[in-house]
Amino acid sequence: MFEAVTNCEVSIEFVKEENTTIYLNVIPKLIIDVVYAYGNMPTENQMISGDNYLVKEQNNGHMLFAISDGMGKGYSAFYESDMTLHLVEDIIKLNIDPSTALTILNTFYVVQDYLERYATLDFLDINRHNGNATFYKMGANTTYIFKQNKMVDKIINQSLPLGIDEEVDQSSYQLEDGDMIIMSSDGVVENLIDNDLLEEFISNAKDLAPQQIVYEILNYTIKNQIKTKDDMTVIVLKISTRKKK
């Protein structure tokens, strides 16, 4: 009954009994684990990257990952993307769900569009209780999900950066054991002539640790380009399911 209501596995803990009333705690179980790593590299001739990233593990069993790419390069781009992620984090701290938080943030950017400053946002919310992943994309790069069976699923951006579209692009995806998620800023793929070769390269590196995969992706991009045209940020996540006891 409890699992039907909560849509996830639960454990029941006895708290106390008073007269004819029994008090129980219903605790959702975590069914997936997430191992992750991230890396960032500025464009040529820049001391600082215009990309920023956010990784946050919440007490409610959710994990949040985000990449923001500020308009332009250098400190101005860094400031814009850094402010974007700080605003996201501040709104979520108010116990507002990510979907509402990002709608509020997007509205804020719509209102202040006269500033002519924009940032992309690639946001991922993973529910570790039921394995559901929700992707929010606002001008963001494609996210790749590498499967155990060698297939690759893609979450493709359908909207413009924050403050330009009134709607927030949102997609749900059910994660499975062995999935590997690659989030990146557009500097990674824009530098390459053939993105299919990058997919093949990542697929062959799938058995490596997440941090090593981050390094390999950045190094591959550098070696297979003429010039670093944009900042590059990569987040690699590996999903594993817990065995039922």
Each language-model region and where it sits:
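Acidic loop->beta-strand submotif enriched in PP2C/PPM serine/threonine phosphatases
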Residues: 46-59, 121, 154-193, 227
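Core mixed alpha/beta domains of very large multi-subunit molecular machines
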Residues: 2-61
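Catalytic core of PPM/PP2C metal-dependent serine/threonine phosphatase domains
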Residues: 3-22, 29, 78-148, 223-228, ...
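PP2C/PPM family metal-dependent serine/threonine protein phosphatase catalytic domain
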Residues: 28-52, 106-110, 139-172, 218-219
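Active-site-proximal, acidic helix/loop segment immediately C-terminal to a metal-coordinating Asp/Glu
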Residues: 72-94, 153, 179-228, 243
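Intrinsically disordered or compositionally simple regulatory linkers and C-terminal tails
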Residues: 23, 241-245
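Short hydrophobic-aromatic micro-motifs
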Residues: 63-66, 135, 181-184
